[in-house]
Amino acid sequence: MGKQLRNQRHRALMAAVASTRIRAGLTQRDLAARLGRAHSFVGKVESGERQLNVLEFCELADALKVSATVLLSKVLRG
């Protein structure tokens, strides 16, 4: 398997993160600041270059001020 996972659910995750961030009025830099990470982290997550573990997913949801359950439901709906 290559460096970038490009299955349907991973693409749905990338889209859910980006759309939720944009709907919240945040830039990638804003979200990265909330996470205490470099802005490239958010860009890599949204582009599919970086996968998230479950704890990072929960931290991301918290930073977006949505529940992890809501964010996950967006991913599962595709």
Where are these regions (language model features)?
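A short, Lys/Arg-rich alpha-helix, primarily the initiator
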Residues: 1-23
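Short basic helix-loop element that most often maps to the first helix and adjoining turn
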Residues: 15-34, 59
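Conserved hydrophobic/aromatic packing and binding residues within compact polymer-binding modules
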Residues: 17, 31-32, 42-45, 71
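Helix-turn-helix/winged-helix DNA-binding modules
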Residues: 23, 49-52, 63
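Recognition helix of helix-turn-helix/homeodomain-like DNA-binding domains
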Residues: 35-52
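DNA major-groove recognition helix of helix-turn-helix/homeodomain DNA-binding modules
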Residues: 55-70
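Short amphipathic recognition helices of helix-turn-helix/homeodomain-type DNA-binding modules
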Residues: 70-78
